[in-house]
Swiss-Prot record:
Record protein name field: Phosphoribosylaminoimidazole-succinocarboxamide synthase
Keyword Translocase: no
GO molecular function: ATP binding; phosphoribosylaminoimidazolesuccinocarboxamide synthase activity
Keywords, ordered alphabetically: ATP-binding, Ligase, Nucleotide-binding, Purine biosynthesis
Provenance organism: Brucella anthropi (strain ATCC 49188 / DSM 6882 / CCUG 24695 / JCM 21032 / LMG 3331 / NBRC 15819 / NCTC 12168 / Alc 37) (Ochrobactrum anthropi)
Family: Belongs to the SAICAR synthetase family.
Highest taxon of source: Bacteria
Length: 254
């Protein structure tokens, strides 16, 4: 790892130079952060689980024709991805009132929304990722109107897919965050889904008990984060049924 050139390090992942031009290696760390890293802890096994869950989801997205940056998983913590120009926006799709939306609008957490809502947040930790409008996005040149249309179309398709995927394993998709990037192929450019989709970036509730199976367990000091992520992986079929939580981290199907 030390021989590779580090391109970027974020709160939960590191990007290294890839083996071929136009590729990067995405490494998943065990760091758990909340409130723009004001709360931080290292949790053994979290990176392994996020890598496997995100791999599973991105593989399925690619399979149904939703373009992503994902190429393949390299090992338990790393993925090979296409190099993209990240658009500095977090795209949040909400199906159920929770988190900041419930607080901002005075909604009872768990209220099913009349329809799915798409929100944009400007990626700037120093500013606490402020919510922005399409007017802000176009005025400051973060994305063009056609690109916004593409991003919203992708967000709707991903939401439809994830809602069905998780419903089939007894989980309600409350909301999720995704990022997009510009993938250049010669003179052609298209918008693709980038970053990761995992319990770090989605609120996932057990459909029967409303038990939280996501990073809210860390945000709210509930404990059991790795066990919750393992449960998601088990239901998705990427963990052995007989695997049990261990301090050294999870055991996953290769």
């Amino acid at each position: 790892m030390n021989r590779r050139r580090r391109i970027y390090e974020g709160k939960a992942k590191i990007l290294y130079e890839g083996p071929e031009p136009g590729t990067l290696v995405q490494f998943f760390k065990d760091d758990a952060t909340a409130f723009n890293a004001k709360k931080h802890e290292v949790i053994d096994g979290k990176g392994v689980l996020n890598n496997r869950i995100s791999e599973h989801i991105f593989t399925q997205l690619n399979r149904i024709g939703i373009p992503t940056h994902f190429i393949r998983r390299l090992n338990m913590r790393e993925q090979l991805i296409k190099e993209v120009e990240i658009i500095p926006l977090e795209v949040v799709v909400r199906n159920v009132a929770a988190g900041s939306l419930a607080k901002r609008l005075g909604l009872e957490e768990g209220t099913v929304l009349p329809r799915s809502i798409i929100e944009f947040y400007y990626k700037a930790d120093a500013l606490d990722d402020p919510m922005v409008t399409e007017e802000h996005i176009t005025a400051f040149g973060w994305a063009s109107p056609p690109e916004i249309d593409d991003i919203m179309a992708l967000a709707i398709r991903v939401n439809d897919f994830l809602t069905g995927l998780f419903l089939g394993i007894g989980i309600q998709l409350v909301d999720f965050k995704m990022e997009c990037g510009r993938l250049w192929e010669g003179d052609m450019m298209r918008i693709v889904v980038a970053d990761e989709i995992s319990p770090d970036s989605a609120r996932l509730w057990d459909i029967t008990t409303n038990d939280k199976l996501d990073k809210d367990r860390f945000r709210r000091d509930m404990g059991g984060l790795v066990e919750a992520y393992q449960e998601v992986a088990r239901r998705l079929g990427i963990m052995n049924e007989n695997d049990t939580p261990r301090p050294a981290g999870p055991t996953l199907v290769k």
